[in-house]
């Protein structure tokens, strides 16, 4: 029997061989990544090392297929990260984004300083050192920028740039993860406690919706309608959903013409920054369970409905006219796990969960209006994903010309899609784009992307890996790369924990983002089921990517011209 087909499949250069090789690399890597060494497992990061081993034994991809797979995998990964963190990205940026970006800049510039010092101490050419630097911080666009700049300056290429990158990259990944573990050990950090702190901070977020039960005590609001009270409290975000008559203790749905009397009680939804003003203006707070606002004999019920009709995407809550048409009040809106005050001006997005209070008889009509179809929500919105990827590639390819630098700087195929994903997931509703993706679909997209990327990086680096280490001084290059990786991260990690009291979950994301390292983010995500690492990563990634590319070009320009 002719077995040539099997030989071609296993050792050829065709499409089937490439797909099979990537699949085997990923499967083996994920399986071996579950093994714990000293209680630590590398997870999907192990795919990289399986790729290096297979690449060393001659299992290679066709160069064009390799390049496509690697870039497409990276794009899928960063785009899904952007979609995940987008809804909460800008509030996070306002609260701690400046500090995180300054710390990330510190990592970048300490890495550059370490590289320059090693260049003068060891005598290794700067072109090689820039390759080692790019590998040590796992930054492929920086490598590409350095190679292009060197070629433009000299008219020839320098293979040691790529070799330096290849030998430093694997230990770079390990070093970034090691820095997280070392910081955790030094400060005796409990991941569970850090998660509790993060949950507590999110609960006290200025945008979070909180419920108050108030007794009307201010004479200024006696005999006033809720519409008149709203005018007096203009500029403050709140919703009064129900009132309790002080004489009969009967509970009613609040309307704009509802009149407040002394000792009436009101159920208010607001945010922490408005709590004091509203409480002091209306009266005094009393402790009442939410269930007391819906007594068993009442006709009022509370239901949660999911916005699933795409035609509602971008429409304001007030435009639904639920109170006017159906006598219903929306008290809270939950978006991506964040509770928000149900203001009439709030734009709705597919996937929002509305808490609606009103008559049980009218609930089916409201459900029909909003959608509330989990089946529809599970349908993937592929069009918006690929529109976003396309726009991201355009943005990433846009040359940014800076004074005094002959070569334009670009965000690259990773930075562009990340920025666009963040913007679309936050503002896509304004352009009628449904960007909602179920958490499971987003996770699938993210894991497929990162594993394909790691498999390709490993297979590409494996071919000359051992030769470089044994015959070309690669052992010392690995050591220098590890210093460039570890030293800046430990210094900034210490400053972040000791000086700025940065939450460890956010710190992991910031350290991964400051080195533009997807495997480290994957490790951080596996450490906790919180999205704080992804938010920290996305907060610093765009600026870091820009600086990594810029500094790689500047080092070549200043030292190799």
Curated annotation (Swiss-Prot):
GO cellular component: plasma membrane
Stretch forming the signal peptide: none
SUPFAM superfamilies: TrkA C-terminal domain-like
Principal cellular location given in the protein's record: membrane
Domain of life, source organism: Bacteria
The keyword Metal-binding is assigned to this record: no
GO molecular function, one term: monoatomic cation transmembrane transporter activity
InterPro entries listed in its UniProt record: AAE_transporter, RCK_C, RCK_C_sf, YidE_YbjL
All residue ranges annotated as the RCK C-terminal domain in the record: 196-284, 286-372
One GO BP annotation of this record: potassium ion transport
Membrane topology: Multi-pass membrane protein
Compartment(s) where it occurs, according to its Swiss-Prot or TrEMBL record: Cell membrane
Keyword entries, A-Z: Cell membrane, Membrane, Repeat, Transmembrane, Transmembrane helix, Transport
Entries under Pfam families matching the protein: Asp-Al_Ex, TrkA_C
Entry keyword annotation includes Ribonucleoprotein: no
TM segment ranges: 10-32, 37-59, 74-93, 100-122, 161-183, 384-406, 411-430, 443-465, 475-497, 504-523, 538-560
The family this protein is said to belong to: Belongs to the AAE transporter (TC 2.A.81) family.
NCBIfam families associated with the record: PRK03818.1, YidE_YbjL_dupl
Protein name: Uncharacterized transporter PG_1411
Organism field: Porphyromonas gingivalis (strain ATCC BAA-308 / W83)
């Amino acid at each position: 029997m002719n077995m040539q087909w099997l030989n071609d499949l296993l050792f050829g250069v065709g499409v089937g061989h490439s797909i099979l090789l990537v699949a085997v690399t990923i499967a083996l890597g994920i399986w071996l990544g579950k093994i714990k060494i000293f209680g630590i497992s590398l997870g999907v990061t192990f795919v990289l090392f399986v790729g290096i081993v297979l690449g060393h034994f001659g299992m290679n991809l066709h160069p064009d297929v390799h390049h496509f797979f690697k870039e497409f995998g990276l794009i899928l990964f960063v785009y899904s990260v952007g979609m995940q963190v987008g809804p909460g990205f800008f509030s996070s940026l306002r609260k701690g984004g400046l500090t995180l970006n300054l710390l990330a800049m510190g990592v970048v510039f300490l890495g550059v300083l370490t590289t320059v010092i090693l260049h003068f101490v060891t005598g290794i050419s700067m072109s090689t050192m820039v390759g080692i630097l790019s590998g040590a911080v796992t930054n492929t666009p920086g490598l590409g920028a350095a190679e292009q700049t060197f070629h433009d300056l000299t008219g020839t290429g320098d293979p040691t740039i790529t070799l330096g990158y290849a030998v430093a990259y694997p230990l770079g990944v390990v070093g970034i993860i090691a820095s997280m573990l070392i910081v955790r050990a030094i400060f005796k950090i409990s991941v569970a406690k850090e998660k509790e702190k993060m949950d507590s901070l999110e609960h006290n977020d200025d945008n979070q919706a909180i419920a108050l039960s108030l007794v009307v005590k201010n004479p200024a609001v006696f005999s006033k309608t809720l519409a008149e009270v709203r005018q007096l409290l203009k500029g403050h975000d709140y919703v009064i959903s129900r009132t309790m008559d002080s004489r009969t203790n009967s509970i009613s749905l609040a309307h704009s013409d509802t009149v407040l009397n002394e000792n009436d009680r009101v159920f208010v939804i607001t945010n922490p920054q408005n709590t004091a003003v509203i409480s002091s203006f209306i009266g005094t707070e009393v402790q009442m369970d939410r269930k007391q606002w819906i007594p068993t004999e009442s006709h009022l019920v509370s239901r949660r409905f999911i916005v699933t009709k795409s035609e509602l995407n971008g429409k304001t809550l007030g435009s639904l006219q639920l109170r006017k048409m159906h006598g219903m009040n929306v008290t809270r809106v939950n978006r991506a796990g964040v509770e928000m005050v149900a203001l009439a001006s709030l734009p709705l997005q597919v996937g929002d969960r509305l808490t609606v209070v009103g008559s049980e008889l009218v609930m089916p009509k409201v459900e029909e209006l909003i959608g509330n179809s989990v089946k529809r929500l599970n349908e993937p919105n592929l069009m918006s994903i690929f529109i976003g990827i396309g726009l991201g590639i355009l943005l990433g390819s846009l040359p940014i010309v800076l004074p005094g630098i002959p070569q334009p700087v670009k965000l690259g195929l990773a930075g562009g899609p990340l920025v666009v994903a963040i913007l679309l997931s936050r503002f896509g509703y304004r352009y009628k784009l449904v960007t909602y993706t179920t958490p499971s679909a987003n996770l699938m997209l993210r894991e497929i992307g990162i594993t394909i990327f790691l498999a390709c990086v490993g297979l590409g680096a494996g071919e000359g890996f051992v030769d470089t280490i044994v015959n070309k001084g690669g052992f010392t290059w690995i050591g220098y790369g590890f210093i460039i990786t570890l030293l800046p991260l430990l210094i900034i990690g210490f400053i972040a924990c000791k000086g700025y009291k940065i939450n460890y979950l956010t710190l992991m994301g910031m350290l991964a983002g400051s080195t533009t390292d997807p495997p480290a983010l994957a490790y951080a995500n596996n450490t906790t089921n919180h999205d704080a690492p992804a938010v920290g990563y996305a907060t610093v990634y765009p600026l870091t990517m820009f600086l990594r590319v810029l500094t790689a070009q500047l080092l070549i320009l200043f030292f190799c011209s």
